[in-house]
């Protein structure tokens, strides 16, 4: 197949191949999540919509942050690994007690083995300057997004 070219039509037949089909599904799910979770677009220019959890893990190149909307009911926690090393039991700090449900994972979830339900209840264990935390198997070059209230 040829690279994208603004002068020609897209090679839609490629969407039938597994790798391309998975990428198309991933993009579709990203758009669905964007529409479903106002935390991704509301309060964009307001610090109330964003909170760093860990921006200082330079040794492992893993960053985590929270996006919020004005209701605080559909918060999203992002954990991103920028290295080729998987972290089997990565502990991430969270601001409150509750259940954190995986909604997007570019390694373990929706794009390789079908629906993947994963929820973790936070425990009272300080991490990243937060009073609660939970552990998650973070894949190499992986991004995990969790919803919580």
Say what each PLM segment does.
Residues 1-149:
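Carbohydrate-interacting/catalytic domains
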């Amino acid at each position: 197949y040829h690279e994208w070219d603004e002068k020609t039509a897209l090679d839609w037949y490629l969407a039938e191949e597994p790798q391309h089909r998975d990428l198309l599904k991933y993009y579709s799910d990203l758009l669905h999540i964007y529409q479903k979770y106002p935390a991704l677009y509301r309060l964009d220019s307001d610090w109330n919509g964003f909170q760093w959890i860990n921006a200082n893990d330079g040794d492992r190149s893993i960053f985590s942050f929270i996006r919020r909307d004005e209701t605080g009911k559909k918060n999203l926690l992002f954990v991103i690994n920028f290295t080729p090393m998987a972290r089997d039991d990565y502990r991430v700090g969270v601001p409150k007690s509750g259940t954190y449900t995986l909604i997007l994972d570019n390694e373990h979830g929706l794009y390789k083995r079908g629906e993947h339900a994963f929820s973790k209840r936070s425990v009272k264990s300080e991490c990243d300057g937060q009073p609660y935390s939970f552990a998650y198997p973070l894949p190499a070059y992986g991004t995990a997004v969790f919803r919580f209230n």
